[in-house]
Amino acid sequence: MLIKRRRSWELPENQVTPEHVFLNRRAFLRGSTASIAGASALMVAGCGETSGAAEAAAASEADLTAKAAELFPYPANTSIPVDRPLTDEEVASTYNNFYEFGSHKRIARAAEALVSRPWRIEITGEVEEPFELDIDELIAQMPLEERIYRLRCVEAWSMTVPWSGFPLAALVDLAKPKSTARYLKMQTFMDPSIASGQKQVWYPWPYTEGLTMAEARNELAFMATGVYGKPLGEQFGAPIRLAVPWKYGFKSIKSIVRFEFTGRKPVSFWEEIAPSEYGFWANVNPEVPHPRWSQATEEVLGTGRRVPTLLYNGYEEQVASLYKGLEGQNLFR
């Protein structure tokens, strides 16, 4: 049994969500898991215009997702680092950035085109031996938990989300990188036939992001495979996405298919598009404005309130040491 010590940034989950609400939600999720496959099958059966191959693919996805849902809820080992309540699931699920499917926020419907299971993941680059595995094979080997994190978008809004998944450090250990690996480069899927945004050839698809190895091994770096106590919805970046809460949200790449360990610093998606506005590091700092707007405050989604933004989004104690000696670099853009 994995015994976890409470870190300085953790609070009991019942301080974030009233205990009876949280326990009722978990009981509901346990009882409703079995219904997912049946409901999905009915939805597929009701689409008379769908081809047989598409029906089979949808049924397979529904079955695999239902099996993944049986693992939920994950043990809740962490909580929000400040007194800020969870963002309502409806709000968080209907206000999303996912440029593969469009540049607007109501992306959930378009993102349903993404088939998130089966899903193959490639581990490559400066590792002892490159390999591929299925998302559920990966999940089966990982220490699973739920963490409640802030998410601060570079657009000056924020939400507070209960991610389910595993520490990125566990994936790094599984990959067995060589000593020559200094960075972890991640890429999302590439399929313009379902992702209309990828037909916009002026963007440098596929979406690419990167971390230093020190950042990837930091205790806060997290791979999310679920949210709100169930598998990730497509708009959140199913079936696996990054969550690095001390950085602006565009660093938390979605729907990852490739992890490459490399000795060369990756050029990220937005860095390639507008390097004067978006950089490799992208750490949150209220005193460093975006070239076109202030980062001093943020709108908390669903509340109508603006609050002061905190250095490293409130996670300074856990991550500031990562950047000692790098003061000459553009750490906050």
Regions found by a protein language model. Name each.
Residues 1-27, 34-42:
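N-terminal secretory signal peptides
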Residues 9-16, 48-75:
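N-terminal leader/transition segments
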Residues 21-27, 38-63:
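N-terminal twin-arginine translocation
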Residues 27-31, 43-47, 242, 248, ...:
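Hydrophobic transmembrane signal anchors and adjacent membrane-proximal interface regions, especially
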Residues 28, 56, 196-200:
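Short alpha-helix boundary/capping motifs
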Residues 31-32, 171:
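Generic alpha-helical secondary-structure signal
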Residues 62, 66-333:
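Structured, non-membrane catalytic/scaffold regions adjacent to prosthetic-group chemistry
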